[in-house]
């Protein structure tokens, strides 16, 4: 639950900051503060923070700080693209190397045949590369308001749909001692 809150909390803060707090600058500030609080809470409570969360928060702190200092919203808008490309490369390379990173993230929930982890790595890499392209299209061609709405009402449902589409692979290839 804490992990979910730490992922969604900053997005909610950004959305609220944009629509109720005066625009993209305030939204960025609220998201930065919320992200630091969330990652700190994860560390204090769980005594660990995932590598992906560290990467995500670092990119956010850099792009968000540049946005606040420069007043140019482009930097916060390219943050998702940068993250999606980084994550895409991580999942792609881990699949190529036959050492799927996604296995370490999910094996406490589901145990799969090794080749299924590799397939899932490639699919996840493709998803992140796709999301990078979509983010670039949206932020470059639409208003700040449309981009913010896309981040909340587009990215979250598309991610959920992607996860649901992976269920047949997971269910077909799970090992007997798997939790799902």
Curated annotation (Swiss-Prot):
Q: What highest taxon heads this organism's lineage?
A: Bacteria
Q: Which cell locations does it reside in?
A: Cell inner membrane
Q: Which UniProt keywords apply?
A: Cell inner membrane, Cell membrane, Membrane, Transmembrane, Transmembrane helix
Indicate the principal place this protein occupies in or around the cell: membrane
Where are its TM segments located?
25-45, 49-69, 76-96, 118-138, 150-170
Q: How does the entry describe its membrane topology? A: Multi-pass membrane protein
Cellular component per GO, a single term: plasma membrane
Q: Which NCBIfam families match?
A: ispZ, PRK00259.1-1
Q: What does this protein do?
A: Plays a role in cell envelope biogenesis, maintenance of cell envelope integrity and membrane homeostasis.
Family, per entry: Belongs to the YciB family.
Q: Which protein is depicted?
A: Inner membrane-spanning protein YciB
Task: Identify the gene encoding this protein.
Answer: yciB
